[in-house]
Amino acid sequence: MGRPPCCEKIGVKKGPWTPEEDIILVSYIQEHGPGNWRSVPTHTGLRRCSKSCRLRWTNYLRPGIKRGNFTEHEEKTIVHLQALLGNRWAAIASYLPERTDNDIKNYWNTHLKKKLKKINESGEEDNDGVSSSNTSSQKNHQSTNKGQWERRLQTDINMAKQALCEALSLDKPSSTLSSSSSLPTPVITQQNIRNFSSALLDRCYDPSSSSSSTTTTTTSNTTNPYPSGVYASSAENIARLLQDFMKDTPKALTLSSSSPVSETGPLTAAVSEEGGEGFEQSFFSFNSMDETQNLTQETSFFHDQVIKPEITMDQDHGLISQGSLSLFEKWLFDEQSHEMVGMALAGQEGMF
């Protein structure tokens, strides 16, 4: 069953302390000091138990006890210690020497407990409000981010459209300018060179001459990559043609100047055989020499114009065969020889 409480003993007084009892207890503790609380009732003659004497001294009579309202620091300390130690008020009061355990307990039960409950409730509300505000702010932030992204995308699209329109607007005037500038000024291209060369060849060569040289072109086609009537028109061929034409002009002149003299030689011999007398032969030969000199000057000019393109073209691509050139020369010189014979006979008739 344990030891019975001391207050239940016979002759032990209960209830509040009187001022006289307080004075006796304070005078004894000042003389002997606080301690050995079991001997205090017997030495002082107080009809109180030892526990009642200790609590009366600790909570009310000892010096340095602070009365009145608790400060904010004391409240925080009490709340913190109560959370750590629980309802052990004496241990909590040891950390606050100016406050008694009874005062701390009473203040906790009457004020701090209710205040802390309100703070927790308001904190929960605040947390709910903060969480709701956080969620709403997050939603707003997401929506703002989304709106900013959409606006940025729209601006990028608008900028791309504007750049495209500017590029097209720049292309249009440039194209119109190029078209307007290309009208008055000719543009040198490979196609234009081909057209020009084909038109030039069509003007220079007669289609009827191609029919007469069909026999010679069949043989020349086997050796030359291009037929006599076809000209491979390109910038390179025209450049080569011009270069070879400039190089071959002295050759053509030498050929034209030398060939008529050799070919007119048999003409004078033939005319001399037809004559009978030596004087007539010498006179005719003298006249014929003068005429042949004039003819050589005239024929050299024709040879320069005829042989130049044919020799150069034949050296480059073999476009006009050698047979057609020889036929043309024979026809030309035969016609000149007949005219020359007629002129000589007319001169003889005048003399005789």
Swiss-Prot record:
- Annotated region described as Disordered, given as residue ranges: 119-148, 207-228
Q: Which InterPro entries match?
A: Homeodomain-like_sf (IPR009057), Myb_dom (IPR017930), Myb_TF_plants (IPR015495), SANT/Myb (IPR001005)
Residue range(s) of DNA binding per entry: 37-61, 89-112
Query: Disulfide bonds, which pairs?
Result: none
Known partners and oligomeric status: Interacts with HDA15.
**Which PANTHER family does the entry link to?**
MYB FAMILY TRANSCRIPTION FACTOR, TRANSCRIPTION FACTOR MYB96
- Purpose of the protein: Transcription activator involved in the activation of cuticular wax biosynthesis under drought stress. Binds directly to DNA consensus sequences found in the promoters of genes encoding very-long-chain fatty acid-condensing enzymes involved in cuticular wax biosynthesis. Functions together with MYB94 in the activation of cuticular wax biosynthesis. Involved in drought stress response through abscisic acid (ABA) signaling. Mediates ABA signals that enhance plant resistance to drought by reducing stomatal opening.
Q: Could you identify this protein by its name?
A: Transcription factor MYB96
- UniProt organism field: Arabidopsis thaliana
Lineage of this protein's species? Answer: Eukaryota, Viridiplantae, Streptophyta, Embryophyta, Tracheophyta
List the gene name.
MYB96
